[in-house]
């Protein structure tokens, strides 16, 4: 924003995407998604449509939650990419909010970032029970990620890998936006088959 202001260009800082600009903000939550849409509604003078959209999302989230089995304390790991060190979602990333809204726990939610790298040792030590595999819809997608995890010397012994407990979620379903809600439904349905 500082580089554009001198040119008279107004900017909007998106909460999840620009976390590096405000490390004092709260953890990711669905409320942050809703507030972003409210902000956009105000900017484009579409407040009524924004409120209706948010109301519909909240209703759908309530519907998803009403069908949940007890996922309390279930350990989930989101694997985006990386073989030397896994790239994953931290406490400011929307997937953490989605996982927590389902009552489960993102094992990397202690990472003080939205997205970042951790170690395989830390992931294996947390023994995830369920995996969210990011599917960029290129190459082998989630199948390739799972094949890698099955061959990894530490990860192959984790509960999620041994039980092939995972769901493939597309990138756009995990970045803040309308697709988050149905991605939560996909996650809940896949978790129901495991737990």
Describe each PLM feature range:
Residues 48-102:
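Basic- and aromatic-lined ligand-binding clefts that recognize polyanionic substrates
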């Amino acid at each position: 924003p500082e580089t554009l202001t001198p040119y008279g260009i107004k900017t909007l800082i998106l909460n999840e995407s620009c976390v590096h600009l405000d490390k004092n903000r709260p953890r990711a939550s669905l409320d942050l998604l809703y507030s972003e849409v409210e902000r956009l509604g105000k900017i484009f003078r579409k407040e009524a449509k924004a409120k209706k959209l948010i109301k519909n999302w909240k209703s759908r989230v309530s519907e998803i939650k009403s069908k949940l089995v007890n996922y309390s304390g279930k350990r989930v790991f989101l694997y985006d990419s990386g073989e030397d060190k896994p790239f994953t979602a931290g406490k400011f990333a929307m997937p953490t909010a989605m996982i927590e809204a389902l009552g489960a726990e993102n094992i990397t939610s202690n990472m003080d970032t939205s997205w970042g790298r951790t170690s395989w040792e830390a992931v294996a030590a947390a023994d995830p029970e369920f995996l969210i595999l990011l599917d960029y819809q290129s190459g082998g997608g989630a199948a390739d990620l799972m094949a890698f995890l099955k061959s990894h010397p530490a990860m192959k012994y984790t509960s999620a890998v041994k039980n092939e407990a995972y769901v493939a979620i597309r990138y756009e379903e995990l970045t803040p936006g309308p697709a988050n809600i149905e991605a939560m439904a996909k996650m809940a349905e896949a978790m129901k088959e495991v737990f």
